[in-house]
């Protein structure tokens, strides 16, 4: 079945659509805070440079390449766990601040 359409011109439709919607203030805050991006970049640089530095430093001091590779892998995991821990702590701080704000509103 065909649907019935009104005999409205495109100019009338445009006038109705702009007249019905009040102007809204746009939110220009970034979706992700700057300190989060900087923290991610810092840990990314550390994730690349620390294992490589550890590998070449241990190789330069005469360690075998096997032990150098193992130490580089361990350092990569340490940095990964540090990043997870820092993100977890930051999330807890946000939750505590939100809970305090809700408790203040409830009073």
Swiss-Prot record:
Biased composition (Basic and acidic residues): 1-10
Cysteines joined through disulfide linkages: none
Keyword check for Oxidoreductase: no
Lumenal side: 57-66
Region called Disordered, residue ranges: 1-29
InterPro entries: Vma21
TM helices/strands, residue ranges: 36-56, 67-87
Record's bilayer topology term: Multi-pass membrane protein
The keyword Transmembrane helix belongs to this UniProt entry's keyword annotation: yes
Biological processes annotated in GO: vacuolar proton-transporting V-type ATPase complex assembly
GO cellular-component term (any): ER to Golgi transport vesicle membrane
Motif interval(s): Prevents secretion from ER: 104-107
Segments in the Cytoplasmic topological domain: 1-35, 88-107
Localization in the cell: Endoplasmic reticulum membrane; Endoplasmic reticulum-Golgi intermediate compartment membrane; Cytoplasmic vesicle, COPII-coated vesicle membrane
One Pfam family per UniProt: VMA21
This protein's UniProt keywords: Cytoplasmic vesicle, Endoplasmic reticulum, Membrane, Transmembrane, Transmembrane helix
Family: Belongs to the VMA21 family.
Function: Required for the assembly of the V0 complex of the vacuolar ATPase (V-ATPase) in the endoplasmic reticulum.
Annotated protein name in UniProt: Vacuolar ATPase assembly integral membrane protein vma21
Biological source species: Aspergillus terreus (strain NIH 2624 / FGSC A1156)
